[in-house]
């Protein structure tokens, strides 16, 4: 089934739920590292809000978009609370209350998410910062909140997901342009790269437009995206995960376990942009100023683990946690164990050549006044 519409992607794009060994909750250590690296940017954003007299408000409204069900969103809430307490002590002022909205698509495991909201995260109403948390299911590519209602928006490793597989990936004769691949690769024709960038441009612009209506003037957004350093989207730094998954799928095709047509017609609804592409889209939109934009690299694997099979297995489980729902929708639930077992073996083989580092982008924006 092709992911050709926003509605279809919204139904199947979510992380593995629960708390089992292939759940996102148990396999989010990499995104936890990314979030930790980006935490100073979020701290600075809260500090900036307080420098603009946002501490005089009765409540600070913050949203975490694409929150999933792992522990990372809890760290975000705790950090915002700590910064609010710190700034209000420095300013000798009464601390505003904190309203946090946790957003993700309808298939997200909100039960596991809210089960993890311990008193250590939210605190009690007698603390300096009274914290209230609400779930907001829905697509962040459209409006989610009333006009001028948000002061702070955070999103980590979510905005690079697309509303649909890129348009225009079939020829006039109806043939697949990206045959045998599920994402941009070195063998992809230029039209595939152009289609992916065009879809990201359209979707990120929709995201910015929706937030421009919801965020108050001078409000802040802190966005962390999976991105790339190179200007070429087919470089291995940005496509190696999808490339290895495509190899695993192709092997199951050769064994007769998957129809070849299913592989040829599947294109992942995700795009890892360059810093220049992100900057260009924000400036074209014109609703926000860029306060900070940087890229940084992290090892894709647990490098302190010496056993390559343990490292490969950890990486495969991490990838399975965020890809299985959308992959199984196309190729069938019944072959997922075989597919990811094959993927693990391919990853371990690739360890001999060393996997490339993963690039993340930190983007801090302020809503333009007027």
Curated annotation (Swiss-Prot):
The pathway where this protein functions is:
Alkaloid biosynthesis
| Entry keyword set | Alkaloid metabolism, Magnesium, Metal-binding, Methyltransferase, S-adenosyl-L-methionine, Transferase
- Which residues participate in S-adenosyl-L-homocysteine binding? 24, 67, 72, 104-105, 139-140
Its catalytic activity? 7-methylxanthine + S-adenosyl-L-methionine = theobromine + S-adenosyl-L-homocysteine + H(+)
Name the residues that bind Mg(2+). 178, 264, 266-267
Q: What is its EC number?
A: 2.1.1.159
Q: Residues that bind theobromine, according to the entry?
A: 31, 157, 160-161, 226, 322
Tell me if Magnesium is a UniProt keyword of this record.
yes
The protein's job, in short, is: Involved in the biosynthesis of caffeine in cv. Puer. Involved in the biosynthesis of theacrine in cv. Kucha, a caffeine-like xanthine alkaloid with diverse beneficial biological activities including anti-depressive, sedative, and hypnotic activities, improving learning and memory, increasing exercise activity, and preventing nonalcoholic fatty liver disease. Catalyzes the conversion of 7-methylxanthine (7mX) to theobromine but not able to convert paraxanthine to caffeine.
- Which family is this protein grouped under? Belongs to the methyltransferase superfamily. Type-7 methyltransferase family.
Question: What name appears for this protein in its UniProt entry?
Answer: 3,7-dimethylxanthine N-methyltransferase CkTbS
Organism the protein comes from? Camellia sinensis var. assamica (Assam tea)
């Amino acid at each position: 089934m092709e992911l050709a519409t926003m509605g279809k992607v919204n139904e199947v794009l979510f992380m593995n739920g629960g708390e089992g060994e292939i759940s996102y909750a148990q396999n989010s250590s990499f995104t936890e590292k990314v979030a930790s690296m980006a935490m100073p940017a979020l701290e600075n954003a809260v500090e900036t809000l307080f420098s603009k007299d946002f501490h005089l408000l009765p409540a600070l409204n913050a949203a975490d978009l694409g929150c999933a069900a792992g522990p990372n969103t809890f760290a975000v809430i705790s950090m915002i609370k700590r910064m609010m307490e710190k700034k209000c002590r420095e300013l000798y002022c009464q601390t505003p209350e904190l309203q946090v909205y946790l957003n993700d698509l309808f298939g997200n495991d909100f039960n596991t998410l809210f089960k993890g909201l311990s008193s250590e995260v939210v605190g009690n109403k007698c603390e300096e910062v009274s914290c209230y948390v609400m779930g907001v299911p829905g697509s962040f590519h459209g409006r989610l909140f009333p006009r001028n209602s948000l002061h702070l928006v955070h999103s980590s490793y979510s905005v690079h997901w697309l509303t649909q597989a890129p348009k225009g990936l079939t020829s006039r004769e109806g043939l697949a342009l990206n045959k045998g691949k599920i994402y941009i690769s070195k063998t992809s024709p230029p039209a595939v790269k152009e289609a992916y960038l065009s879809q990201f441009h359209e979707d990120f612009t929709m995201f910015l437009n929706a937030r421009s209506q919801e965020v108050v003037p001078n409000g802040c957004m802190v966005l962390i995206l999976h991105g790339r350093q190179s200007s070429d989207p087919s470089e291995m730094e940005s496509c190696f995960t999808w490339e290895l998954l495509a190899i695993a799928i192709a092997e199951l095709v050769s064994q007769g376990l998957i129809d070849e047509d299913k592989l040829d017609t599947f294109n992942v609804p995700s795009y890892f942009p360059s810093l220049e592409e992100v900057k260009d889209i924000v400036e074209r939109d014109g609703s926000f100023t860029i306060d900070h934009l940087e890229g940084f690299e992290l090892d894709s694997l647990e490098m302190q683990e010496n056993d390559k099979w343990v490292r490969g297995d950890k990486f495969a489980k991490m990838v399975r946690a965020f890809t299985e729902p959308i992959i199984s929708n196309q190729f069938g639930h019944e072959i997922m164990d075989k597919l990811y077992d094959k993927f693990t073996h391919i990853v371990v083989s690739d360890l001999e050549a060393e996997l490339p580092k993963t690039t993340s982008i930190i983007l801090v924006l302020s809503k333009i006044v007027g």
